[in-house]
Amino acid sequence: MDVKTLVGEYYASLPSGVLREFVEDPSSREWAYTFLKGRDIVFTRKRRLDEVSGFLELYHSTGKFKNPKSWEGLLGWDLVIDVDAELPEEPEAFLKSLGRLLKDVVIACDELRRALGFPRPDVVNFSGSKGFHVRYFDSTVRRWLRWDLHERRGIKPGEIIQRVGRGVVWLAREGFVAGDRVRALREGLLDDSMYDLKRLIRCVGSMNVKSLLPAVPVWSREGGRWVDFRDEVLGMNDLELGCLVAHRTLTWPGRGGLGVVLSRVLDLDTDADPEDPSDFVEVWGNVMSVLGELKP
């Protein structure tokens, strides 16, 4: 099996509409894709999600526009925080580091709420490679920023985003967001890309071609209360938590998904209990070995 076949089988296994599930008003977004041509990965933009097929990766704009193709008529904006770390390749070390990073994400979200008045996230998802994306949807951002009030005062949407974004980044860099576990906030966790009006972000459910793992949700508002998720995350050891996240990459969205494809097409055993780390680490190591041989 080659990369193109694996990725195609993965997308074909997903239920209809699942790639739009965590995108508010998808018709107002610019969509972008990567394709494999020969040995090169090429990037292209299109107007709508249903305009193309055969892609490797899928991205959408964080902004919402009247005319998405030309980025004109800003209607709203998702705030997305990208939390990355250098994760080791050895399976058990990778899983421990992944679990530790998710704990840092949860603590950082609570600290942003305490120090800067951030709302609760709408979605936290594994990026498919080195970390997590924390997503605040446009509807949440509007309430938080009192968007309608600013518009009545004649402030354009782009100005609202730029003012707030620069202010939040400055506060974080100046140390108003404290705590040893969130020191990364002053080292690039909140950066200028956060309020870039033309920013593109990997779609939840998209494959990440660097790792051949999908970007899957680990928590959403629809899935339960933030406080329960936080307590569960902080109450687990790093390895157990990393196993749960990795297991999610194999089993999401519950019908189809990467694990089903690997089992069906490559006869690879992906059926391991994440609550039994010794068993899961072995299975995960096999998965990483197989995917590593396929990477472009």
From Swiss-Prot:
Keywords: DNA replication, DNA-directed RNA polymerase, Magnesium, Manganese, Metal-binding, Nucleotidyltransferase, Primosome, Transcription, Transferase. GO terms for molecular function: DNA-directed RNA polymerase activity; metal ion binding. The keyword Lipid biosynthesis does not apply. It comes from the Archaea. Its EC number is 2.7.7.-. It is an enzyme of class 2 (transferase). SUPFAM superfamilies: Prim-pol domain (SSF56747). GO terms for cellular component: DNA-directed RNA polymerase complex; primosome complex. The active site is at D82, D84, D191. One of its GO terms (biological process) is DNA replication, synthesis of primer. Its cofactor is Mg(2+); Mn(2+). HAMAP family: DNA_primase_sml_arc. Catalytic subunit of DNA primase, an RNA polymerase that catalyzes the synthesis of short RNA molecules used as primers for DNA polymerase during DNA replication. The small subunit contains the primase catalytic core and has DNA synthesis activity on its own. Binding to the large subunit stabilizes and modulates the activity, increasing the rate of DNA synthesis while decreasing the length of the DNA fragments, and conferring RNA synthesis capability. The DNA polymerase activity may enable DNA primase to also catalyze primer extension after primer synthesis. May also play a role in DNA repair. Belongs to the eukaryotic-type primase small subunit family. Heterodimer of a small subunit (PriS) and a large subunit (PriL). This is DNA primase small subunit PriS. It comes from Methanopyrus kandleri (strain AV19 / DSM 6324 / JCM 9639 / NBRC 100938).
